[in-house]
Design a protein with these regions (language model features):
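ABC family nucleotide-binding domain
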Residues: 1-145, 149-158, 162
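C-terminal boundary and immediately downstream tail of ABC-type ATPase nucleotide-binding domains
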Residues: 163-185
Length: 185
């Protein structure tokens, strides 16, 4: 990450963590804190960002994810798609260089998925941030990714450009099976 080998025992992982954001499939918001407090918490504690600057950035991020009107709401008052967009805003508040997404749409109702994917597409298009996305949303991967890594049983089976992976037939039988099943729906 950012030129450092995480597997190298000499690498100080704690120095790298502040440059890497993570969006989990189950949001992990603090239920006892408002939306804006959830977004402002890590930058205040980790980065020691001043309150006014922190609040201003949090509101900009809420606007970016289409939820500025929910700043004072509690997580229990939000839909799953709204919670996931708040989780994305919370990660962006740390101004990471790399953002990791772990199946960000898997816990969502189908009608909420597009809202989250639209936010992610906007990040991919309008920022210079590296995004690593674990997803089964192949349409999203095809539209946004510049590289596709296909994994099965914990092993990398394919590592190609998006054009090659989706344009040509994948080189492994397992990837071809997967692609034929999802294209059949």
């Amino acid at each position: 990450v950012n030129g450092f080998a995480l597997a190298d025992k000499k690498t100080n992982v704690n120095l790298i963590r502040k440059d890497v954001g993570m969006v989990f499939q189950h949001f992990n918001l603090y239920n006892n804190k408002s939306v804006i407090e959830n977004i402002m918490l890590a930058p205040r504690i980790v980065l020691k960002r001043p309150e006014e600057e922190n609040r201003e950035l949090a509101m900009k991020l809420l606007d970016k994810v289409g939820l500025a009107n929910k700043a004072e709401s509690m997580p229990a008052q939000l839909s799953g798609g709204q919670k996931q967009r708040i989780a994305i805003a919370r990660s962006l508040a740390m101004k990471p260089k790399c953002l990791l997404f772990d199946e960000p749409t898997s816990a969502l109702d189908p009608e909420m998925i597009d809202d989250v994917l639209d936010v992610m597409k906007d990040i991919a298009k309008n920022s210079n941030m590296t995004m690593l996305v674990v997803t089964h949303e192949m349409g999203f991967a095809r539209a946004v990714a510049d590289r596709v890594i296909f994994m099965a049983d914990g092993r990398i089976l394919e590592d190609d450009s998006t054009e090659k992976f989706f344009g040509d037939q994948p080189s492994t039988e397992r990837a071809r099976e997967f692609m034929s099943k999802i294209s059949g729906h």
